């Protein structure tokens, strides 16, 4: 990946989702809704951590709004011609520059929960993928 979007989003390790779901089902809590998010991070930092973990160069170019608007249109044309599924859609291009922040305090308080870091999740997944090569 050479490019990174300018946005931010909430990320969570799938193991945390599974564990929190099981803990909630096993508890006496009912009728509540929870946001299960480990960390709010910029795409730049997540993409950098992924690159480092996979021994690849870190992304260095900003995927600006105008660049992403052009990219999703070109991708749509390419996929129309090749009859393939789009990897970058209008929606993903536009949301990738939004700054979304999620609050996980409610689930932390309810379960006394401690989330894994996203760096840990990335390293766990990367080590698995690198072993497959």
Regions found by a protein language model. Name each.
Residues 1-12, 20:
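A conserved pocket-lining segment of Rossmann-fold NAD(P)-dependent short-chain dehydrogenase/reductase
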Residues 6-8, 85-90:
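Short coil/turn segments at secondary-structure boundaries
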Residues 20-86, 109, 118, 122-133:
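Mid/C-terminal beta-alpha module of Rossmann-like enzyme folds, strongest
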Residues 43, 88-103:
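Active-site loop of classical SDR/Rossmann-like NAD(P)-dependent oxidoreductases
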Residues 112-113:
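A short, basic/aromatic helix-end/turn motif that makes direct DNA contacts
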């Amino acid at each position: 990946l050479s490019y990174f979007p300018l946005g931010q989003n909430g990320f969570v390790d799938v193991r945390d989702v599974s564990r929190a779901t099981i803990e909630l089902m096993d508890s006496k809590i009912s009728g509540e809704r929870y946001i299960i998010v480990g960390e709010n991070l910029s795409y730049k930092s997540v993409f950098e951590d992924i690159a480092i973990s996979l021994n690849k160069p870190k992304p260095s170019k900003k995927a600006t709004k105008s660049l992403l608007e052009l990219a999703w249109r070109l991708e749509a044309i390419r996929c129309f011609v090749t009859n393939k599924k789009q990897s970058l859609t209008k929606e993903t291009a536009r949301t990738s520059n939004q700054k979304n922040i999620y609050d996980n305090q409610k689930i932390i308080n309810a379960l006394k929960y401690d989330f894994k870091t996203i760096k840990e999740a990335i390293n766990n997944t990367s080590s698995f993928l690198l072993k497959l090569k």
